[in-house]
Amino acid sequence: HVLDATDSFVHLVSNQTDLTGLPDDVIAAAADTAKQKGLEGWAFTLHFPSYYPVQQYAQNRSLRRLLYEAYVTRASELTPQYSKGKIDWDNTQNMIEQLRLRDEEARMLGFDNYAALSLAPKMARDVSEVDSFLTDFAKRAKPFAQKDWNELQEFARSLGLVDGIEPWDMAFVSERLKQE
């Protein structure tokens, strides 16, 4: 369903000023996409060559948000608002069934849960060892991540994003910071 939801999404931009910041080749590709679909303007899809440059370069925050929200809700209960009402593309029940089957498989093979089964052929001895490793790793990494986050937020404010960084701003702000 993810591919169906990805393939079905097209956002048409009709105002060229909404494309400010996008590289010329991305704008040309969007114009070609629109033309191929019999549309006028610039058509953006959720395929990565179309989607990611918008996240990375588009100064239009609303455009970044629209594509971001459509991308992260593909094949979910939120898909219909972006996929022409195709609620049959919702993978929620498929995911629930997959989790149930994994749990059933683990128990049939004598494990407490799927995590324990998954760890059987791996270096970690058990789930608690993995939890301990991840907790320790998070404690060690947090100060560095916090420093980077603070730097990114400060830079975002200098770009006029005074209300904070939203998920659809991350690639854009990071790219701008990298260019500085």
Question: What are the language-model segments listed below?
Answer:
Residues 60, 94-95:
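Generic alpha-helical segment signature
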Residues 35-80, 170-177:
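Active-site-adjacent "gating/activation" loops or surface patches in catalytic cores
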Residues 1-46, 97, 101, 107-180:
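Active-site-proximal, well-structured secondary-structure segments within enzyme catalytic domains
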Residues 71-84, 88, 117-123:
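Membrane-interfacial helix termini and the short, flexible loops that connect transmembrane helices
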Residues 85-92, 98, 108:
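Recognition helices and adjacent regulatory flanks at domain boundaries
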